[in-house]
Amino acid sequence: MPRSSATARKSHSNRHDNGVVGSGKKVSKQKSNGHLNGNHANSSTPTSGPSSQVDWPSSRSNSDTAIPTTAAAAARLNGATENSKDIRGHLNGYAKGTSDMSYGQANGAVPQNGCLPGDAARRTEKPATASKRSGSSASVNPLHLASTILKSCPMYDTIAILIFLLQLPPMVLTLVQFLFASLTFMPPSGASAGSLTSNFDIFQGPAGTPSLGTMIAMDGFCLLFWGLFMWTWAQNFALDLAHVQVAITLGGGGSGKNGGVNALCVGIVLVLHLIRSKGIQDFVMGHLLSAKIISPDLLSQYSHLIPAEFRRTEPQSSPSWIRSLLAVHILAQAGTAMARRSMAKNRAPAPPRTGKRIDTEASAGSQTQFDSAFESGASMSSYIGPDGQFITPATHKDGRDRLISAKKRRRQANQVRSRQPFWAALASTKVTVMREYEHSRALSKTARGLTMTEDDLQGVSLDDGLVWITDVDSSTIRFAAGDFSSPDDASGSGVCETGRLSDDMEPFYVCVNGAQWATATISKVPDARKGTSAVHWRGEISGLAPNCAYTCSFMRSDTDEEICAMSVKTPATSDAEQVSSISAPPQPTYRPSSPTTTLKNSIINAEAKLNEKRSRMKKAKNDHKLVVSKIRKELENYNHRLHSGTDENRQKQRSLQLERNIKQTEEATAALGEQLDNLENIPEEELEEWTMQKAKYERELELLNSVKEELIAARSAVAREVSSLESELNSTVQRRERLQGRRTRVNEQYERIISANAQGLNERERRAAEQFAREQDQAKLEANFNEQLASITQSIQEYQLRTNQLWQQSAAIEQAIQQQQQQMLMDSAPLTPEGNLPGTNPLGDTPSLALAGLTTSAPSSRSLLGLNFPPLKSSPLQHASSLVGATSSHPASPTQTPSYLQHFPTSPLANASSPFDPDFVYRDRSFSNRSGRSSLYGFDLIDSSRRAPFQFDLSEAASEKRRSSGSESNGPNLGLRPISSPFPRAGSRASGSGSGGSGSGSGSPSSAAGKGI
């Protein structure tokens, strides 16, 4: 049954966001404009002050009132677009000014009613009927009103939709489930574009729905439960439960106290699955047959009556993963909705028993949806009214009441959708389809309503005349029009009749807010018929006030028929001076002004602009006078300076300029000096910081040095280890070579044995062969030794000859020195004329002592006949030789002829290690490499009385001979060694004589023997 009139009045202003036809009175739209002449009270549309005219941005972007006629739908559609940047020409009278511009209607439509192009012709034919219909309120037929209201039957709707869904094929069912699942991610109806990016809408859930995070969490949990714990029969049953959820949602079974609907639908699906289950069928049939309740004959007789769908011969198969995912999502959201519904029911107080079915989830979500919309639009300090005027909080006193009314309307819309969602969706679909159809029909001549410019209309022939806005200024509106001539006008152009217009006359005139506008100029485009341009007329409406809304009507000049009407709002002026000088117009109402008011405002605006222009002209004139007088004075000054100026004056000016530059330079230099002084004085803080940094740097440097020392020590240790390892490696290599040599000898012996055995020799012959081989080796060795002995003997003989020569030279030199000294002493005179001084002992008294001293010290003199001999260098071997009783002097006379072939004294180094030992490389160079020229001036004396019989080592002699091959001595360098047994292996580091008599100076035979090589 229809609701009461009070309820109808409350819901009359409701904007059904999705085109839902709610319960209420049928709205009757008037066909003519009753606001042009100020007759607002005669309007049949019930209003409650400004609240019925304001459209909030959050609810008017995609919303319209329930529209009973297609004409009203088209009118609503044509007035729903705004633009804030681009001001271009639009066809069919649809104009855009600035962002403040309101709705523009086309083809004879004013802001309150819109009609198609055909309505203008029909209104021309029946003007009286239209005016009569506009002046009276249409009566409402109760039967027609009752037929437009659907009774809420959620149980029937839900069951019907469930039966319909169960009969669909699997592919269609999958598509339906996908569409239904996608609806959970859609934004709420009536939400603005700003609310889509609101954090509240995304995470808190708009329109009572759970948040995105909650949905994802529930889907994941249900999917895990689906894959782990549900078998095939349970999965197929869950798929049909998803169909139940879709049917309950579309049929409204979840609203109010409809728990019975849910249980009934679930029971139907459960019974169907139990009947279709093969296991249950086998169990029931087996139990009936075993209990003999039904005989097999009776069962086979009536089994053909059971539908084929119920007779399963094979078990059910698992559903596809696509259907499983969709079913999991739908069931998860159903469980979430049930939980939210129970929580809201527990929190909310007990509702009064009014008999109304209320969806607690939808009612709880209405507040959420409104809050989210209010959050997204709370930052707006003003909004746009129906006339394009910005309504600020200062001028809008009842803003809170409007918020409350919008809140109530949104809650009512949610309640209507929750009661009859399926039929509401059908009604919304119908309204949307009809709206698009009327829209395409109304704009079929202009490329289906797309925004077009004059360039897009080149070459397009239009049947009816069209007028469109090309530019909107603060005080002017420019428009263009097509060709208004018709074939009837062309046929009757020869006869000038009343109502017919010539080609040069204006085919239409302009009315602004119902008053014919005298300042509107219309001009014909020259040569418009010759070309293909659609523009035939251009015009301009001037004398308008800025920031005001106007309804511009274009009327035919011959029939006074209205061509089109549009609502345009002029933008605010951008000139700050004009805004400050011109008084602001009174606050416009929410309806167009009357013609008288419009004309008065236009006159006031024109006078204000005229006064402003006059004041500006006067101000500009005064400014120009001042500028001209100033320029004249400057010109006279320059002329005077030009005529009176001389070279002297120019030089003075130049000197003054230079002095000025010098002064500026000095000031700059002083400033730079102060800066330098400031820079030289180091602040204490920086100095302390520098000291700290320096100490830190020194510590780090010490640490670095210590680390470097540690590194060097580590490297040296590693180097020592490496050297020791290398020495070990060398010794190992030598041992390996010896072993390899031994192995070679053993192999040779083995081969000889093998060869001997192979030749059949006996053991005696083999031993004889070995003995013969040994004898041959010994013979070779003996021959080698004999050769070495012969060479050594020859070398000894050569050394003896050279030694004799050296002794003879030494004796001659000593005799010459003694004779020279004696001659000097004999011929010497006293140093003073008086003779020898008292207390002195002349040398002549003791000639024997002096001669003995000279004779003794002669060999140690380092200057002999102008030759400088190097001083004798002490050697550690001299100390070693002194231990065996060797003397440091050589008292032997040169006349003695020592027998060098007698016994040599035993060397103290006779027990020294072999020269092949490792310490052989550290031998003193003075023992092995003496210069051969040193034998010319001295020779190491050898005491023959202390010598043992001469013996030598052949191996040592051979090695010494090889080492002395690079010496400067001409004679052979043989290492002689006094030994007690023939061919001993023990050698001395200082045994033998030097390389070819390379010893120097005189000395004791023991020391010479110790220094010999």
Curated annotation (Swiss-Prot):
Residues 33-64 have a biased composition (Polar residues). The chain crosses the membrane at residues 159-179, 212-232, 255-275. Residues 993-1002 have a biased composition (Gly residues). Keywords: Coiled coil, Membrane, Transmembrane, Transmembrane helix, Ubl conjugation pathway. It comes from the Eukaryota. Belongs to the acrB family. This is Probable ubiquitination network signaling protein acrB. It comes from Aspergillus terreus (strain NIH 2624 / FGSC A1156). The gene is acrB.
